[in-house]
UniProtKB/Swiss-Prot annotation:
Gene3D superfamilies: 3.10.450.720, Vaccinia Virus protein VP39. The lineage of its organism: Bacteria, Pseudomonadati, Pseudomonadota, Gammaproteobacteria, Alteromonadales. The keyword Cytoplasm applies. S-adenosyl-L-methionine binds at A119, S120, A121, P122, G123, S124, K125, E143, D170, D188. PANTHER family: 28S RRNA (CYTOSINE(4447)-C(5))-METHYLTRANSFERASE-RELATED (PTHR22807:SF30), NOP2 YEAST -RELATED NOL1/NOP2/FMU SUN DOMAIN-CONTAINING (PTHR22807). This is Ribosomal RNA small subunit methyltransferase F. Its EC number is 2.1.1.178.
Length: 484
């Protein structure tokens, strides 16, 4: 049962719109959240995913503001995180309300090419943005917490998002280092978390108005910095999972007062059918738990009408960038290796970079950012150069195969075989049906891909009697659940 202290209840009663009931708000705070997921369209179409999972008995109810989002009903026993389909990146476990900010960012046919997600971890919104961008352009995903950067990176790789650059900074530096560099920015700000009580009953046990006021000051700094980093004409979406106006409307008002000639609020009243139920006079979405039976959330869409004066001068460019472009011979050899080994093609508009014996693939849009700030991870690691030839990296075949969908040199696994593969086991060729065994018998031995649901799981080495598992040790799972 949610523990709402008296101070919070008294505070929220004043904030609650007149047409909503405090008693209903308290009742919804005690209701468990519905499970929700988002289909990863970088790897599978929503229609195909729905067909596969409804055949397995999943009951999916669409989230109205996200074409790829669904609530799962009637399957209380589902351990979503251990499902094969989750491990292979076909879906992300994401609270329905948190799908709103990326949807707002790309509403009205926004075709932003260079995007910043200021506070990205664990990666739900960042990977949603990557899917909306269809792995094109550049997504800079930042996270202040060092431990959470690792989680963010793991989720970016699992979902096959390749046009990303990860950073580890306080979000307040972007206006200084990358002034007016982004077409669109999502600032899902750190907040008091008042909307999360349905999944954390103790979230508001020690609520205090002084804490709300204090975090509001940080939010003001963050939104100012994000606005400075936004190009004129660009879109900034400010969002939180909290309910107090001090952390929501008042932060947007602060930005408007700071840059009165450059800030324009764009209405989200028509973002989806029923959005008007949560829409404020300014056009913000203030989502109370009882409106859509979801977490509490706030979303504002802000357009930058004009350039604004930067606060600080551009810092000096950083030296000693450890990567260099591959030469034409190296690019040709690596391209041929991926095609001969896996029937995978390297994107011609991306840039192959070299660091020692490591080959990387950078988004072309990243190149102007070199030297402007330190990046934790850029693009994807393609392969290591060996004494003879190359050794492909798992993240490369996952990302590249997502673009070509089940390339020719791939062996489809059964559910049981896929389970074994993800648990680090080799696959005996005798476990395939007779036609497939005959096919394997005439195939040349060596590296090849394995897939499930026609989506690549990883690399194996065909040794004749078995397919040797090359899954990286840190990705091997102890528990993999089958639902088909």
């Amino acid at each position: 049962m949610a523990q709402l202290n008296t101070n919070f209840i008294n505070h929220i009663e004043k904030e609650l719109p007149a047409h909503l009931s405090l008693q209903e708000f308290i009742a919804y705070c005690d209701k468990p959240l519905r499970k929700s997921i988002r289909v990863n369209t970088l790897k599978i179409s929503t229609a195909q995913f729905v067909h596969i999972m409804t055949s397995a008995g999943w009951q999916l109810s669409p989230v109205p503001w996200c074409a790829d989002g669904f609530w799962i009903e009637g399957k209380d026993d589902i351990q979503l995180g251990n499902a094969i389909e989750h491990i292979q990146g076909l879906f992300y476990i994401q609270e329905a309300s948190s799908m709103l900010p990326p949807t707002a960012l790309f509403s009205n046919d926004n075709t932003a090419e260079i995007v910043l997600d200021v506070a990205s971890a664990p990666g739900s919104k960042a990977t949603q943005i990557a899917a909306l961008m269809n792995n094109s352009g550049l997504l800079v995903a930042n996270e202040y917490s060092a431990s959470r950067v690792k989680v963010l990176h793991a989720n970016v790789l699992r979902m096959g998002a390749s046009h990303t650059a990860l950073t580890h900074f306080d979000g307040r530096v972007y206006g200084e280092y990358l002034y007016e560099s982004f077409d669109a920015i999502l600032l899902d700000a750190p907040c008091g978390g008042e909307g999360t009580v349905r999944k954390d009953p103790l979230a508001l046990k020690h609520w205090d108005i002084d804490d709300v006021t204090a975090i509001g000051e940080t939010q003001k700094d963050l939104i100012e910095s994000a606005f400075l980093a936004l190009k004129p004409g660009g879109i900034l979406v400010y969002s939180t999972c909290t309910l107090s106006q001090l952390e929501n409307q008042h932060i947007c008002y602060h930005l408007q007062q700071t840059y009165p000639d450059a800030v324009e609020f764009e209405s989200l009243a028509e973002l989806f059918d029923g959005a008007d139920k949560a829409c404020t006079e300014e056009g913000f979405l203030h989502v109370w738990p009882q409106i859509y039976d979801s977490e509490g959330f706030f979303v504002a869409k802000i357009r930058k009408k004009a350039s604004v004066e930067r606060v600080k001068k551009q810092p000096k460019l950083q030296k000693n960038f450890p990567f260099n472009p591959a030469n034409e011979k190296q690019k040709a050899e690596l391209t041929q290796y991926f095609y001969d080994s896996f029937c995978l093609e390297l994107p011609s508009d991306d840039v192959i970079m070299l660091r020692d014996d490591e080959y990387w693939l950078f988004p072309a849009q990243f190149m102007p950012f070199i030297g402007k700030m330190r990046f934790q991870r850029i693009g994807i690691k393609l392969a290591d150069a060996m004494k003879k030839g190359y050794k492909a990296k798992h993240e490369a075949v996952i990302a590249l195969s997502a673009a070509t969908h089940n390339p020719a040199k791939t062996m489809e696994l059964s559910a049981a075989q896929a389970q074994d593969f993800l648990m680090g086991r080799d696959i005996a060729t005798s476990t395939f049906d007779q036609p497939t065994q005959q096919q394997l018998a005439i195939m040349p031995q060596g590296e090849m891909l394995v897939s499930y649901h026609k989506v690549v799981l990883g690399v194996v080495k065909h040794l004749g009697h078995r397919l040797k598992n090359n899954l990286p040790r840190d990705l091997v799972r102890d528990n993999v659940n089958l639902y088909l």
